[in-house]
Amino acid sequence: MWTYPEIDPVALTFGPLQIHWYGLMYLAGFAFFWGYGSYKAKFSDHWTAERVGDFLFYGALGVILGGRIGYILFYDLAHYIAEPLDVFQVWKGGMAFHGGLIGVMVAMWLFARKMQVSMFVVADFVAPMVPVGLFFGRIGNFINGELWGKVTDSSLGMKVYDPTLNMVVSKYPTQLLEALLEGIVLFIILMFYTRSPRPLGAASGLFIGLYGLFRFYVEFFRLPDPQLGYLFWGWVTMGQLLSLPMILIGFALVVWAYRNNRVMAP
């Protein structure tokens, strides 16, 4: 059984300026997107390295604004109404993937209009790179010591201090499980899948469906947010409620793409 290493969430300090690991993880995700996206653009009819850089600006705004607004609306609206200045303390965490997804979808729609192409041209190009950003985000959650799983006596558990119990307990490190499934595994699947021609929209649907499936599964090991608890039947969490439509819509989009879309994405 492992022991949580109690990592300082502040990576660097320059006088009054503090640089947090959580923010650096976002920068790492954006840097990967630019590097890998620029490489992929060499084999695309629609993309160039310059366009990848332009979209990165749109996408970063979508991720940060959508992720923050989504967390506030879906998970802790009452707190932020009472403490509105906490909205700006993003270095403490409090980002929701589902809100970030909506933000990125808006960014992709706007960028597709700018490129004068189908939104799926943008979404299919972006989809394989998103899991690496999710990986870095979950590592940031781990460093911050947040989003722990349930108490367990399993060998997969990690010893961590629980302030609500005022004692050290063993919990599932669900941040690392999400980093593995939603990050590494999903990236590998999409990377190999997008190497071959496929219908336009299929890669986007596969990402949405598999993310929803992986997230729905991990939620069984993860503790619900304390301000929400379980929503239904003593086991359904907000994360599962938001992921279920993703599973249905994502795989339905894959089926639709193969049945109806003759435009093949390279």
UniProtKB/Swiss-Prot annotation:
Where are its TM segments located?
14-34, 55-75, 91-111, 117-137, 172-192, 201-221, 235-255
Spell out the disulfide connections: none
Report keywords, A-Z: Cell inner membrane, Cell membrane, Membrane, Transferase, Transmembrane, Transmembrane helix
Q: Which GO terms describe its cellular component?
A: plasma membrane
Membrane topology value = Multi-pass membrane protein
Could you tell me the EC number(s) of this protein?
Answer: 2.5.1.145
A biological process term (GO) from this entry: lipoprotein biosynthetic process
Query: Could you say which enzyme class this protein belongs to?
Result: transferase
Q: Where does a 1,2-diacyl-sn-glycero-3-phospho-(1'-sn-glycerol) bind?
A: R138
Write out the GO MF terms. phosphatidylglycerol-prolipoprotein diacylglyceryl transferase activity
Statement: the UniProt record of this protein carries the keyword Cell inner membrane: yes
- Return the InterPro entries for the record: Lgt (IPR001640)
Q: In which pathway does it act?
A: Protein modification; lipoprotein biosynthesis (diacylglyceryl transfer)
| Top-rank taxon, per record | Bacteria
Is ATP-binding a UniProt keyword of this protein? Answer: no
Where is the protein localized? Cell inner membrane
User: What is this protein's function?
Assistant: Catalyzes the transfer of the diacylglyceryl group from phosphatidylglycerol to the sulfhydryl group of the N-terminal cysteine of a prolipoprotein, the first step in the formation of mature lipoproteins.
Q: What HAMAP family has UniProt attached to this entry?
A: Lgt
Q: Which family does it belong to?
A: Belongs to the Lgt family.
PANTHER family in the record: PHOSPHATIDYLGLYCEROL--PROLIPOPROTEIN DIACYLGLYCERYL TRANSFERASE, PROLIPOPROTEIN DIACYLGLYCERYL TRANSFERASE
Could you identify this protein by its name?
Answer: Phosphatidylglycerol--prolipoprotein diacylglyceryl transferase
Species lineage, top-down? Bacteria, Pseudomonadati, Pseudomonadota, Gammaproteobacteria, Thiotrichales
Q: Which gene encodes it?
A: lgt
